[in-house]
Amino acid sequence: MALSMDNIVISNEEEIYMMKAMHIPCGLYLNMVLKAAIELDLFEIIAKSTTQKLSSYEIASQIPTKNPNASSLVLERILRFLASQSFLTCNITKNDDGIVHTSYNLTPLSQSLISDKDGSSIAPFLLLATDPVAVNSWFHFKDAILEGEIPFNKAHGVHAFEYHGKDSRMNGLFNRAMQNVTCTEMKRIVECYNGFQGVKEIIDVGGGLGISLATIISKYPNIKGINFDLPHVIKDAPTYEGIEHVGGDMFKSVPQRELILLKAILHDWDDEYCVKILKNCWRALPKDGKVVVIEQMQPEYPETNLISKNSSSVDMLMMTMLDGGKERTKQQFEDLAKQAGFTVFKIVARAYYCWVIELYK
């Protein structure tokens, strides 16, 4: 009789927390296994199969391995691990001859790691987070406390944005990750937030490659968009119908439009720089216009729900990568808006862990 642990009830609190504590280091193992799985296209191979249920040998035969038989034995262990972490389901059947056949298929969790109909997924963000350039920064995390240094700067000698400008591989990895995450987030935002309706022109300040505007305009094709970012950023931006890429510096000035979008910009900067950005937006805004800020938000008191865990994790990322970058509370955002001259601050929607804030003069 096969051993199953699903019916084991652990009621001893000390045992529960000890097992949870022992599982903490496994977070690193999971991320590195997922990195390998993505690089080998394991999830995409399963997704593209006609049955969406494949054995380890069937998967191994579709990856560039020299020996599928030997590789399938290693792969079987990896697939079992991913199934134990809810990224796959395991299906075991026995034919009339008593031969056991094991196959694996995707779960809702692993669906986020395969490309959707628009070609976006969370996979590029995981590859960015597990890249040696990013990982090396975490080895200097304690220096943020001991020496007041930025871990990324300590590891690489330059600011993260400066590093991306010099390393084309890392810059491409970063841009792909941000484009995919932004696409996923913005598709949900345009579903739950109707504040773009009736708007004629939008400028996306710090818009990167323009994916936020492209997603908005796909739903509201009458909108004309300006994607505003540094010249070296927009030079790689693709052409989108209805979008003009304009080079500039948001710390100097922002072009005037009736709606100014700031998505995941303020969390990159300290309070002083944030106020400078917001003041430039205030100056560029017509009297009846609005600034739409999209950011993660910290609760006033630490909470253990998924939204809070996500924002707290990203706050640690900001601490590691950027000088002054951080996730903020509602009150902290409101204080920044007031300092910049805005009189109306409204939280109007939430998509996943992103909050949509409207600012008015």
UniProtKB/Swiss-Prot annotation:
<protein>
    <recommendedName>
        <fullName>Myricetin 3-O-methyltransferase 3</fullName>
        <ecNumber>2.1.1.-</ecNumber>
        <ecNumber>2.1.1.76</ecNumber>
    </recommendedName>
</protein>
<dbReference type="GO" id="GO:0102449">
    <property type="term" value="F:kaempferol 3-O-methyltransferase activity"/>
</dbReference>
<dbReference type="GO" id="GO:0009813">
    <property type="term" value="P:flavonoid biosynthetic process"/>
</dbReference>
<dbReference type="GO" id="GO:0030755">
    <property type="term" value="F:quercetin 3-O-methyltransferase activity"/>
</dbReference>
<dbReference type="InterPro" id="IPR036388">
    <property type="entry name" value="WH-like_DNA-bd_sf"/>
</dbReference>
<keyword id="KW-0808">Transferase</keyword>
<dbReference type="GO" id="GO:0046983">
    <property type="term" value="F:protein dimerization activity"/>
</dbReference>
<dbReference type="GO" id="GO:0032259">
    <property type="term" value="P:methylation"/>
</dbReference>
<comment type="similarity">
    <text>Belongs to the class I-like SAM-binding methyltransferase superfamily. Cation-independent O-methyltransferase family.</text>
</comment>
<feature type="active site" description="Proton acceptor">
    <location>
        <position position="267"/>
    </location>
</feature>
<comment type="pathway">
    <text>Flavonoid metabolism.</text>
</comment>
<dbReference type="InterPro" id="IPR012967">
    <property type="entry name" value="Plant_O-MeTrfase_dimerisation"/>
</dbReference>
<dbReference type="InterPro" id="IPR016461">
    <property type="entry name" value="COMT-like"/>
</dbReference>
<dbReference type="InterPro" id="IPR029063">
    <property type="entry name" value="SAM-dependent_MTases_sf"/>
</dbReference>
<dbReference type="InterPro" id="IPR001077">
    <property type="entry name" value="O_MeTrfase_dom"/>
</dbReference>
<dbReference type="InterPro" id="IPR036390">
    <property type="entry name" value="WH_DNA-bd_sf"/>
</dbReference>
<dbReference type="Pfam" id="PF08100">
    <property type="entry name" value="Dimerisation"/>
</dbReference>
<comment type="function">
    <text>Flavonoid 3-O-methyltransferase involved in the biosynthesis of polymethoxylated flavonoids natural products such as myricetin derivatives, aroma compounds possessing antioxidant properties and exhibiting pharmacological activities such as anti-carcinogen, anti-viral, anti-thrombotic, anti-diabetic, anti-atherosclerotic, and anti-inflammatory effects. Catalyzes S-adenosylmethionine-dependent regioselective 3-O-methylation of flavonoids; active on various hydroxylated flavonoid substrates.</text>
</comment>
<keyword id="KW-0949">S-adenosyl-L-methionine</keyword>
<comment type="subunit">
    <text>Homodimer.</text>
</comment>
<keyword id="KW-0489">Methyltransferase</keyword>
<dbReference type="GO" id="GO:0008171">
    <property type="term" value="F:O-methyltransferase activity"/>
</dbReference>
<dbReference type="Pfam" id="PF00891">
    <property type="entry name" value="Methyltransf_2"/>
</dbReference>
<feature type="binding site">
    <location>
        <position position="229"/>
    </location>
    <ligand>
        <name>S-adenosyl-L-methionine</name>
    </ligand>
</feature>
